[in-house]
Amino acid sequence: MIQPDNEKSWYAFKIFFGKGKPIKAYFVTNEIEHIYDVKKEYWDKNKKKKLVKEVPIMPSLILFRTTRIEAEEMERKFLNKVMLYRGKNSENLKEPSKISEREVKIFNIVATSGVEGLDFYDEYNPKFTKGDKFRVIEGPLKGAEGYVVRIKKDHKLYVSIKGLCAVTTGYIPKAFLQKIE
């Protein structure tokens, strides 16, 4: 099914060499809905003072909502700084990969929750999407859905955008999880 060129969808850029700030500035200036959140990290230099540094949560990925034509134009505008993900969620390998609204919403709940112990993965790993699916019903991750996986002897919630990336959480009490039938 071919989508009309003027219909807005979610897309993703892979960002090269930490060039996210000018791209985020472009999105803000042009009022383009996007997800490229930062967190504050504290650096202790010589144990004298603390330096606060803003670090992107997902340094090599920015999600944005626009039309297919605008997404391709932005890729040309930021040549050698970004790459538009293509063919991950569609049959045509040259077509930009559209991301469902639901996947973006669930991924954003986890990515921007501010909880400790989040690990981000630049690649989607289908081996972690086997088994039972769960929904978080309490706590700061309420509303997130994913698979409970075992990584380095710990059980974590694996939330992904199919074909693009994933995030795992730290420990979530079983009482906060509801199995999705």
Question: What are these regions, as identified by a protein language model?
Answer:
Residues 128, 137-144:
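Short coil-to-beta-strand transition motifs
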Residues 144, 155, 168:
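Residue-level signal for beta-strand positions within conserved beta-sheet cores that form or flank
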Residues 1-133, 158, 163-178:
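Acidic-enriched and Gly/Ser
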Residues 143-151:
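Short beta-strand-centered aromatic/proline hotspots
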Residues 58, 151-153:
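Structural motif
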